[in-house]
């Protein structure tokens, strides 16, 4: 897989936000929509790097349409990539669903994914899919700062403390020990944060900021969703993770006040076919299925993410992409390439 080609796709995608891609073996031609296939008695195993309820709804609908027997294991992005790597010579799964684009790009570059040109690729904006079919974006994720509204109003507001809405706010002494974030070594969300800060601020100022932030953080979690859950429960005041995860917590009654901070990092959650000959026809059919509007509606409903299929309506209350204060030149390729180096530096002290 050619990293420069993926970088070109990333920049093209960001042009659309304001108003990656790879080489390798030729992809197989795409098949029909999943709903038109009879796959009864055939099996599909997935590694899923997003919410279990989302995966279950997708799996149930795919099974209803095709008769295929679907099972999945939920793993954070970093753990999923490590597992797929370890199983390279004897793969145990057919599909990797979710995670981050930089991780899928790394998997493709390492020969862990198989390119597949889905017939339904045209349903996904070209800016959010690999041009050779190694992965397809399903929905967009954006980083945000969230805080527990109840705790803030009771414990911090009476003291005259301003609500945290910017990256610099996280460095205030009042918030030391009250911040929870995902671990960039295991979580794609965490890697998106570290990498976007470094790319936006530059190496010198970026590391200066991150080294000041680290002692402020009380806990780093393997999962990108957990920080929002724990902040929502009041165990910590502040979370930094994807706004869709924060919205899911708030929707369950644990109110988080969320702000997409200026120059926020972002990613797409892809689907890719793991190199595994065992269940090829079912795996390809699932990719065809998950790119459809019907699957996209499930993704938006259960994740609050912004679908990469333009026929799918955005989440209620979400601003259009062009109005979000994103870090528009964020390089997904660099995020994947620099992950190990950045994590080693961040946790060196």
Stretches with model-predicted labels:
Residues 203-205, 305-349:
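An extracytoplasmic/periplasmic, membrane-proximal ligand-sensing/linker region
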Residues 102-106, 232, 236-255:
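A ligand-binding cleft/hinge motif common to bilobed small-molecule-binding domains
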Residues 45-56, 91-235:
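Extracytoplasmic ligand-binding site segments that recognize negatively charged/polar headgroups
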Residues 146-151, 268-280, 298-299:
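A bilobed periplasmic-binding-protein/Venus flytrap-type ligand-binding module shared by bacterial periplasmic
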Residues 141, 175-182, 209-214, 220-221, 253-277, 289-313:
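Periplasmic-binding protein-like
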Residues 1-43:
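Short, low-complexity disordered leader/linker segments with a strong preference
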Residues 22, 32-106:
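Early extracytoplasmic/lumenal segment of secretory-pathway proteins
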């Amino acid at each position: 897989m050619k990293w420069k080609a993926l970088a070109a796709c990333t920049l093209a995608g960001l042009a659309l936000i304001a108003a990656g891609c790879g080489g390798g073996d030729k992809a197989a031609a795409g098949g029909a929509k999943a709903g038109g296939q009879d796959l009864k008695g055939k099996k599909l195993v997935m590694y899923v790097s997003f919410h279990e309820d989302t995966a279950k709804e997708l799996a149930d609908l795919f099974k209803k349409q095709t008769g295929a027997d679907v099972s999945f294991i939920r793993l954070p992005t970093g753990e999923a990539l490590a597992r797929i790597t370890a199983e390279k010579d004897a793969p145990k799964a057919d599909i990797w669903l979710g995670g981050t684009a930089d991780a899928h790009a790394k998997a493709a570059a390492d020969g862990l994914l198989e390119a597949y040109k889905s017939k339904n690729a045209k349903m996904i904006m070209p800016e959010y899919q690999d041009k050779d079919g190694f992965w397809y974006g399903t929905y967009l994720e954006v980083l945000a700062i969230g805080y527990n509204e109840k705790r803030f109003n009771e414990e911090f507001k009476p003291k005259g403390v301003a609500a945290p809405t910017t990256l610099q706010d996280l460095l205030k002494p009042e918030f030391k020990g009250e911040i929870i974030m995902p671990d960039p070594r295991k979580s794609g969300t965490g890697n998106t944060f570290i990498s976007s800060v470094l790319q936006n601020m530059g190496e010198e100022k970026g590391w200066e900021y991150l080294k000041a932030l680290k002692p402020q953080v009380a806990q780093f979690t393997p999962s990108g969703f957990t920080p929002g859950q724990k902040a929502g429960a009041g165990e910590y005041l502040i979370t930094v993770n994807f706004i869709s995860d924060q919205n899911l917590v708030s929707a369950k009654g644990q109110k988080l006040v969320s702000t997409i901070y200026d120059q926020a990092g972002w990613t797409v959650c892809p689907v890719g076919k793991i190199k595994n000959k065992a269940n090829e026809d079912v795996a390809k059919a699932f990719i065809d299925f998950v790119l459809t509007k019907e699957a996209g509606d499930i993704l938006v409903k259960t994740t609050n993410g912004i679908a990469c299929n333009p026929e799918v309506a955005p989440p209620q209350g979400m601003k259009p992409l062009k109005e979000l204060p994103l870090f528009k030149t964020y390089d997904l390729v660099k995020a994947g390439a620099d992950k190990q180096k950045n994590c080693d530096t961040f946790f060196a002290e």
